A protein has these predicted regions:
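Sec-dependent bacterial lipoprotein signal peptides
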Residues: 1-19
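Extracellular/lumenal and peripheral-membrane lipid-interaction modules
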Residues: 21-160
Length: 160
């Protein structure tokens, strides 16, 4: 009875973990596996919102374009919350040494360039959060990432 209960709990937890994003697995002859994970626009929206983590930034919207991600929103002014500035930036995702990279460009508050140290922090946290959505094994390396108007697809090699 205990074994059946433990197995049922394990299967439930496993199903919940797999439900986070879609994945396809292909076994290779050397014992490794190629895993393709798909991250939805909603999952990206949540990852970018959490990465920006600025209480003054409101209504952040993630829009998937062919090859990149467009982000827009508003930011309350620190000295006058009744006034807002528009925020926009582009995110390009890539792969370097088996890890996901994020590169923000064209980042502006009301036409003024956003400071680089803020962009560096956002790049790091965005890449880490999106990678966590797709990478489910610590012994995996990212091979490729692609962005379409409906999803982000990452292909990983998982070694045994």
């Amino acid at each position: 009875m205990k074994t059946t209960k433990a197995l049922s709990i394990f299967m439930l937890v496993f199903a919940l973990l797999l439900g986070a994003c879609q994945r396809n697995v292909t076994r290779n002859g050397d014992g490794s596996a190629d895993v393709e994970t798909i991250v939805t626009q909603q999952e990206l929206q949540e990852a970018v919102n959490a990465s920006v983590a600025d209480p003054l930034i409101k209504e952040l919207t993630v829009s998937l374009q062919s090859g990149y991600i467009l982000v827009s929103g508003t930011r309350e002014r620190l000295n006058d919350s009744s006034k807002t500035d528009t925020l926009s930036f582009r995110i390009d995702l890539g792969v370097s040494n088996g890890q996901l990279t994020s590169t923000i460009s064209d980042a502006q508050f009301d036409g003024f360039t956003i400071e680089q140290n803020r962009l560096d922090l956002w790049n790091t946290t965005i890449a880490n959060r999106i990678a966590k959505l797709g990478q489910k094994s610590p012994n995996s390396t990212l091979d490729s990432v692609s962005i379409t108007t409906s999803e982000v697809t990452m292909t990983w090699t998982v070694s045994k």
